[in-house]
Amino acid sequence: MANEDNEHSVQHIGNTILVVMMEVEPEGEEAFERWYNDEHLPERLEIPGYVSARRFKLEEGEGVLKYLCIWELEDASPLEIDMYKAQRARPSEIRDRANQYITQRARGLYKQIYPLTGAYEDHSGYYPEKERV
């Protein structure tokens, strides 16, 4: 969707992110990927207030966990509703299998502090088709 003031697309964004980092034993990565991509992501994104999710795998670095997921939320409320609690309590063979290989996990809930809403964007050189001012 284009914004009237410029030609850049506008995407709904929440003001809270849930950051989840995990370390997984190499022999369990296939089971972990299957669980996260095929079950965990779709289930969580059904919960009202979850906006989006992006997953990353460490390319280089030390002292950090290999897998990262950034969940974008409207606010912290989705983590407190019954649907979220029911998903966490529901048995899942694929999740149980994947969890056997998770050796470390860290999680943090972050609230946006700047700008207060929306996103700060630098368009000065990111869009090469536009003339630079």
PLM segments and residue spans:
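Macromolecular interaction modules
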Residues: 2-133
